[in-house]
């Protein structure tokens, strides 16, 4: 039977492997330093893109290439005030969101203290609907909620017609809009 242990190395072969190991280790350190440098440059570039994008979106409240020029053509003056109230949405950040590696939330997390527990270790929330294990839940299911609404409209129409109370829902359905004649007569 064949021996799978591989070639036997003597003391001389082991001594020759140490310089090769040290050379590879030094090469690995250089590559890791190069990777860190590239990551820093990439982060700086992505931050620059984010800042320029923010500046562009804030300086063009009436209309821009991303949100469209509807407000620009309408000439509305309330757009800037509305933008300040709502803020810039991430959906408009086309360029900074296109990067796979850019994550502004990771930068905010790195600034928070490390004593906080990560989200994956948070306790599982307990729903109150599971507390009643003996009987049925009082929470409506999607089918029971929609089925009840369909029947309730018929009930409302019947009760409002019988009681004489005018309801705005049934009132608008019962009255028909009169046809306006502008002089043209159909024959």
From Swiss-Prot:
The family this protein is said to belong to: Belongs to the EAF6 family.
Subcellular location as annotated: Nucleus
Keyword Hydrolase: no
Self-association and partners: Component of the NuA4 histone acetyltransferase complex.
Name of the gene encoding the protein in the UniProt record: eaf6
Organism from which the protein derives: Neurospora crassa (strain ATCC 24698 / 74-OR23-1A / CBS 708.71 / DSM 1257 / FGSC 987)
One Gene Ontology cellular component annotation held by this UniProt entry: NuA4 histone acetyltransferase complex
Signal sequence range: none
Described purpose of this protein according to its UniProt entry: Component of the NuA4 histone acetyltransferase complex which is involved in transcriptional activation of selected genes principally by acetylation of nucleosomal histone H4 and H2A. The NuA4 complex is also involved in DNA repair.
InterPro entries per the UniProt record, alphabetical: Eaf6
Pfam family, one: NuA4
Organism phylogeny: Eukaryota, Fungi, Dikarya, Ascomycota, Pezizomycotina
Residue ranges with Low complexity bias: 104-129, 136-150
Region (Disordered): 99-187
Cell inner membrane listed as a keyword: no
GO BP annotations, alphabetical order: chromatin organization; DNA repair
Segments forming a coiled coil: 20-49
Keywords in alphabetical order: Chromatin regulator, Coiled coil, DNA damage, DNA repair, Nucleus, Transcription, Transcription regulation
Listed name of the protein: Chromatin modification-related protein eaf6
